[in-house]
Every structure is written in structure tokens, then in C-alpha cells.
Amino acid sequence: MQEARRIRELPPYLFARIEKKIAEARERGVDIISLGIGDPDMPTPSHVIDKLVAEAHNPENHRYPTSEGLLAFRQAVADWYQRLYGVDLDPRREVVTLIGSKEGIAHISLCYVDPGDINLVPDPGYPVYNIGTLLAGGESYFMPLTAANGFLPDLGAIPSDVARRAKLMFINYPNNPTGAVADLKFFQEVVEFARSYDLIVCHDAAYSEITYDGYRAPSFLQAPGAKEVGIEFNSVSKPYNMTGWRLGWACGRADVIEALARIKSNIDSGAFQAVQYAGIAALTGPQEGLAEVRRVYQERRDIIVEGFNSLGWHLEKPKATFYVWAPVPRGYTSASFAEMVLEKAGVIITPGNGYGNYGEGYFRIALTISKERMQEAIERLRRVLGKVEF
């Protein structure tokens, strides 16, 4: 039987392709160093694991959870926002628990997008913004993120007829894949734009806590009026090394949160309650581990930037995320450069065109392996590339 058109038209998921390349190379006996997928390699804090173990022994947690999540977890999220950002959230109406923020990002279009509707999607950007749009029958209008504009979308360049048809605008800062950051002035411009065109802003803040050199990323919800026009997604995945635990949230505008909770109640049965209790421990417990996470990633960032600059690049150190976004050398496309370094150096990088057309000419490096393996990757590239030109 033929698959549905929505499946046939989906692009292959970027990271599934990368994982396949890694597996194939390792089957050939190649010692692969992966700078590709951004999956934290440090352990989850021990007090979080201990909480999971304790709650897993409670039979009450073996039953169906509520789709909107434990009130205690949503309260912990609200307290976290008040402590970090001074943002007030009603945990009952303005927070919903997610099975990882990716799940909510994929589902939010089902709440508002009908066939023929438009979502505003960053390019380059996390592929799920576009995929969720397509699954809902919508169309993506891609907002170019260019180095000349600090990898921020130029809101004034979006045609008014497109903006009037748009239902959702996805933004993501600190940004994957570019590592760019946004300030409250930009967020305020987004709020005014959303008001002008009656659209909903969906801010993906997954990397909000992965920051360096004393920089602290603002929340979109800190911008005056932001809670009237949008929501913010976040999770415990990156700051607490819990990507495999699948626990996140959306928070902000109450009617949007209610709509997302309604979709979830008809699609999934919520996150395992023991994991939610562990999430509470992560958000409310000791935070010294987060300081160490930042220190380790900052050290790795410096190794990558300084190492690639010694090969001829001119990279600046990103203020946030655990990615470095770099141009490909002269004579290569994103894909051809990634293929070459895999074949000749046994190093995986992520081609920028996997994040959209405006990612062409770039590649992404993830800082989620040990510094020793990073240094080895740089030396392998030195042997293969020599000194590069742009």
C-alpha cells in the first residue's frame, strides 16, 4: 500500500542520515570521531538519578500519567522561570509538560495550521519546525538567517501578504545550528510583529542554559507583551544531560498552552511520572553541575575554534549552545566537504544544507565529545587539509 502523501513528501531526517553514515563507516572498521549530533556526553546529576530510582519504586507512578503533566513539575517550571528571569507563570494554565520539547514543537502546528496556512520558519533551522508544519498540511515560509544580520530574521523583509496568512512564527535563541544569540530588543520587535499580524510566536529556548564567558541568554517571555502573543519551549535535556529522559515543557500564553494540552490528550498519555519527579529534582536541586557543564563545553569550544583557526578558518567563539558554525573551504559544498572529511579523516560533521538552503556553504560542529577526541579530529583534518582557503 502506498504511504500517505504527508509521509512521502517528508525530507529524510538529517540526524537519522548522519547516524546511518556513522554505523556504515564503523562496520567498515573505521575509527569515527563524530562532531555531528549534539547529544551531551556528560552524566545526568546523581541526585536526579537517585530521585528517579526512588520514584520508580512507587506503584502510583506505574499508572497512566495526566497528559498535561504533574502539577508539581509545572510548579517547578514556574518557579524556575521566576528565579532565572523574573517571569510569572500560572502552573495550572500557562505550563504544559512535554515528552521532550521536540514533541511539542512537532505538535503545535496541529493546533493552528490548516491546509494552505503558512508558518514562518528560520533557515537554517532545526528541521522539526518545517516537518511539523508539513505534517499539519501547512507551508513553510523560510526566513533567511544570514551572517550579515547576526543570524536573526529580517522581519521587515517578510512580505505583508505572507505575514497575514501566517499562523505561527518559530524562532530559536540561542540558535541551533549557528550559535547566534538574541537580545530583548529583538524579542520586543518580534512581539510587535506578532501583534501586527495576529500570529503566535513559538520560541525554542532549548539552549538557554548553555552559555559562556558570563553571558546569560534572555527568555522571550521577558519581553513586554510576549506572553500575550506566544509561548516558549524548553527542556531538561541540555543543561542536565538528560536527552534520553524525554522531558520538557511549553509555557506562556494560556489559550495556546490549553490547545497544545488538548492535542496531547488525544495523541499521547503524558510523560512517565517518575521522570517528572526527577525533572523537579533537576530544576530545584543543586545547580553546581550546570556550572561544570558550562565550563567543560567552554573549554571544548575554545579547542575547536582555536584548532580550526590554526587551519585557516577565522571563527569567533560563540556565546552559547554547544555548536560551532563554520564556512566550508573554497571549492566545496556543504555536502561535499562533509563527505570528504568522513572518507579521508574519519570525522563526522553536519552539512549546513541539512538545516535549509541558507545553511549551504556552512557546516556544524558539536562539542559533545571529549577534548582528547576533538584534538585528534583537528590533527586528522590538519593532515588531510593542510591550510585551507576561503
From Swiss-Prot:
PANTHER family: AMINO ACID AMINOTRANSFERASE (PTHR42832), L-GLUTAMINE--4-(METHYLSULFANYL)-2-OXOBUTANOATE AMINOTRANSFERASE (PTHR42832:SF3). It is an enzyme of class 2 (transferase). This is LL-diaminopimelate aminotransferase. It catalyses: (2S,6S)-2,6-diaminopimelate + 2-oxoglutarate = (S)-2,3,4,5-tetrahydrodipicolinate + L-glutamate + H2O + H(+). Pathway: Amino-acid biosynthesis; L-lysine biosynthesis via DAP pathway; LL-2,6-diaminopimelate from (S)-tetrahydrodipicolinate (aminotransferase route): step 1/1. GO terms for molecular function: L,L-diaminopimelate aminotransferase activity; pyridoxal phosphate binding. Substrate binds at Y13, G38, K102, Y126, N176, R364. GO terms for biological process: lysine biosynthetic process via diaminopimelate, diaminopimelate-aminotransferase pathway. The modification N6-(pyridoxal phosphate)lysine is found at K238. InterPro entries: Aminotransferase_I/II_large, DAP-NH2Trfase_DapL_Desulfo, DapL/ALD1, LL-DAP_aminotransferase, NHTrfase_class1_PyrdxlP-BS, PyrdxlP-dep_Trfase, PyrdxlP-dep_Trfase_major, PyrdxlP-dep_Trfase_small. PROSITE patterns: AA_TRANSFER_CLASS_1. Involved in the synthesis of meso-diaminopimelate (m-DAP or DL-DAP), required for both lysine and peptidoglycan biosynthesis. Catalyzes the direct conversion of tetrahydrodipicolinate to LL-diaminopimelate. Is also able to catalyze the reverse reaction in vitro, i.e. the transamination of LL-diaminopimelate with 2-oxoglutarate to produce tetrahydrodipicolinate and glutamate. Can also use m-DAP instead of LL-DAP as the amino-group donor, and oxaloacetate instead of 2-oxoglutarate as the amino-group acceptor. Its cofactor is pyridoxal 5'-phosphate. Its EC number is 2.6.1.83. It comes from the Bacteria. Pyridoxal 5'-phosphate binds at S101, K102, Y126, N176, Y207, S235, V236, S237, R246. The keyword Ribonucleoprotein does not apply. HAMAP family: DapL_aminotrans_1.
